[in-house]
Each structure stands twice: as C-alpha cells, then as structure tokens.
C-alpha cells in the first residue's frame, strides 16, 4: 500500500501546497487503492479516474504558477455519495430506476467541491434512495466493512465510510436523514458530521425526506472533517430551506480543541440513550469516553429527554410520508427507467410496471407506509400526531441545552452487525437508528467520533456529540479534544 494514502487530508493539502507532493500523485494513489481493494469492499458505484486526474492537474498547475489555491483542501481527492447530482458521472441513488441516469446539473455541494479544487474520485454506494442502515438495500450489491468483510459498514452512506476506512479516499461526502453519516462513521472508526439542517444546501441532493435530509462531511480526523465542512456549508438561494446565517468557525474550533482543554464546557448525557438494549462493549466504551471528557475538564451531568422514547415511531411515520410524496416523481415519463413502453400498455400500466421493477423492497415498503399515513382517514391519527411528537422532541433538546453546551450518547446500540443478519427484519433494522434519528427530527447538529474498539468483538464504536442548531463549532471543539486525548487507533487495514 502506498503510504501517501494513509496521510490525513490536512497534511496532504499542506504538502501539495509546498510542492512536496502533487495532487496527481495523491489522486493516482487513491485510484490505485480503489482498483486494488474495491472488488473486496464495493465502496464505489462509479469511479471517475480521468475526471479526477484532470481536476488534480489543474491544482498542480496553479501550485507551479504560484497562484493562490482556492481552498485549504485544494488537490485532496474525495469520494461523493451517489445521492448528489453530477453532470459528468451517473447519479443512481443506489436504485435500478435511475441506472445510468446523468443529471443535467451539478448539486450545489458538487459545485462547491469543484470550486475548492477537490478532485472527485467517483460516486459511492448507498442504500437505495438513502433508505436503510446497512447499505444492503443498494440495487448494485452491498458494501462490506473494511474492519470485517462479513459485517455491514452501516447505512445509508456505507460506501463513503468504507472508502475512508479502506484508505481509498481521505475525504468523503454523505447525507444524513436519520443517521446515515454518523452511524456508518461509528461502525468504521471514521468521523462523520450532520450539520445543522439548512446550513448545507440540498439543491441537487436527491430527496428522500426533505425535512430531514442534510448533506455533511466525513473524514478520518476531526480537523479534516471541519475543513471539508467549511467548504460545503453556506447559504444557497436555490434551496428554499437554506439558512441565511454565518457558517460557524468549525475549523478554528477543531484547532482549539486539539489543545485538550474542556474546562467550562457543560456536557449532558441523555438518560434515554443510556442503559438497556445496548451491547455491553458499546456501553463500556461510552462510559470510558464520558470519563475522558470529565478528565479534560468538562462538567458532566445527566439530562432528561422524555419524548425520545417516541422518536422512532414518529420518525417512521414522518419519513415514509415524505418518501411517498418525493418518489412520486419517478413515474417513467420524465427520466430514468421505463418498462413496457412498447405501445401495448397504457401510461398508467407503464408507470406501474416501471415502479415495480425499479424500486427495491424497502423503498416500496416505505412508500406504502407513507401513502397510508397520508390517506384522508388516517392523516390526523398518524402524520399529524407524529409531527406533534417531533415538536416535543425538539423542545426536550432545547430544554437540555439551557443547562449544557453539548449532549453525548453512543452513536449506535451495537457494533457492526453481520451481512444478512437484519435484512429480513425491518423493525430490527429501524431500531439500529435509535441513537441518531432524534437529532434529525429536531434539526440540530451532531458528530460521531471514534471512541475505540469494543471488547466484545474488537469492532469500532462511536461517540455521538450533539449541539444546538447553528452551534456546529461546539461539536468540533469537543470532538477534537476527545480525539486528541483518546490517542491514535489502529486502522482497519
């Protein structure tokens, strides 16, 4: 393995700017690693070697000419979740219904990455339309966890997390609807952040559940994640839900956190996310992390979020309802797959045949649940009640933040489970999102940072850090301080 690919993104960027390395060298090293390992891990759905090397060459030309580089990450390659549109690569969302489809426009996140001089290596595997917790729902086959190829890497963004853990890329982009960035990060010993809702544009992010979806950064260190966060965040007039507010100084917070001083920082432990139902090794790792935060000077106390116990039920009414609405656009008429278009079927039959063939079982399940919840006789009983619970969950967190600065919990109830273990048990799969989805309902920000390996099975465990809306910098200060105190972990490969 080329040692270049083991470097963190900040180091690579500094070496590229100093002419110690070229962006083409770094990008080629990543492409070589993908070629050597992706048959084993299946992290990528599409590799854009020529496009990535072309973007890298542009950065190298700027360095050679002594020009100012467009960002602190210029020249460092990245893996992009296949839910963000790209004009020069297919965007499939892990679904047969979009197989081979190319968007006529770039997502805002894609545009920002290109403008920052970040070569895009390709598009990563994911659960179909971001619905799942294991990346087993991809129409193109599952991604395998580099820590143990018989285990899942989490989902829906398991491809991005696996690419980081396998040293195929130093940076990645994911999307988080109920934990799809944080949960895979926890299972692969990487760092993943769900920014405050509305602070990273959703323009060009193919919608799963519009009020929950949020793009975010992933990397192997907290500082690298902060540097990428700074690139992709910001107001966008093309996204009606975009927040017109200054981006918090996440990079400054991450750098400050490495000093390891959390004196005066108030940390809350969620009572409802600590106790029964967790793997013993996960709980042991979490308690050790809380002790470490205390040793760094943080003031730790327990906080009560009584409505968290209803979060799972509310989420799995709100999300399918939005899915039912959003996925109605895949009607076989405008783009994507079309079945039965031979003149012998009506338009309605073509639509039915196409959706039956193009959508996988989990997507169909959620469409049916959502359509039922939105039906005239059940709208008030289900969807409206779920929205009321959502408000109560947000109020629980608001009340907690009156007495603490951040809230912590395990990122997942167990370590990575086996491939095929939960695929036929939707409820068990849904329960795996227990720790992460309340944050999406509230619209706040959260991070998963590696907290070691479980003594149960020697697999990664994640510490989840949560903060109020527009206080993303708090995540980075606490996360970086904890990361520095925890010390280095061994890698997956």
Curated annotation (Swiss-Prot):
GO terms for cellular component: glutamyl-tRNA(Gln) amidotransferase complex. It is an enzyme of class 6 (ligase). PROSITE patterns: AMIDASES (PS00571). Coiled coil: none annotated. It comes from Mycolicibacterium paratuberculosis (strain ATCC BAA-968 / K-10) (Mycobacterium paratuberculosis). Belongs to the amidase family. GatA subfamily. Keywords: ATP-binding, Ligase, Nucleotide-binding, Protein biosynthesis. GO terms for molecular function: ATP binding; glutaminyl-tRNA synthase (glutamine-hydrolyzing) activity. Allows the formation of correctly charged Gln-tRNA(Gln) through the transamidation of misacylated Glu-tRNA(Gln) in organisms which lack glutaminyl-tRNA synthetase. The reaction takes place in the presence of glutamine and ATP through an activated gamma-phospho-Glu-tRNA(Gln). One of its GO terms (biological process) is translation. It comes from the Bacteria. Signal peptide: none annotated. Pfam families: Amidase. Heterotrimer of A, B and C subunits. Its EC number is 6.3.5.7. The active site is at residues 81, 156, 180. Gene3D superfamilies: Amidase signature (AS) domain. This is Glutamyl-tRNA(Gln) amidotransferase subunit A. It catalyses: L-glutamyl-tRNA(Gln) + L-glutamine + ATP + H2O = L-glutaminyl-tRNA(Gln) + L-glutamate + ADP + phosphate + H(+). The keyword Acetylation does not apply.
